[in-house]
Amino acid sequence: MLGELSTGEIENLLTSNVIGRIGCYADKKMFVVPITYVHDGEFVLGHTIEGLKIKILRENPECCFEVDVMENLSNWRSVIAWGTFEELKGDEAAKAQDKLIQTLGPLMPSET
């Protein structure tokens, strides 16, 4: 698809996917890595463990987020958003984690 997505198409793309890529920059290096996420209508919420991504985002919280859907080589859509990384604590973190579990839980492999 060539052109710009409408606001509704952007919202649909963000809410109908669970894997995107976060891009960040520190020490003259770009870092782009896939993450699982939930879009709550306003924010992109993700969860990760301590590592290079968190280290970089703490040093420079300005980041971008990208999600795409590719149906074939001539039919694909993508959204790129720019924003600021924020670590959630306490009740905010618990609410975000609940949203992640509600959305991602059914996608987890079963042991049965």
Regions inferred by a protein language model and the residue ranges of each:
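Short, surface-exposed beta-strand-loop junctions and turns on beta-sheet-rich folds
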Residues: 52-54, 72
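Short, basic/aromatic recognition patches
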Residues: 1-21
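Charged, gly/pro-rich active-site loop segments
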Residues: 73-112
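Structural motif corresponding to alpha-helix initiation and N-cap regions
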Residues: 7, 50-51
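Short beta-strand segments
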Residues: 17-49, 65
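Active-site-adjacent structural patch at catalytic or cofactor/ligand-binding sites
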Residues: 49, 59-68, 75-86
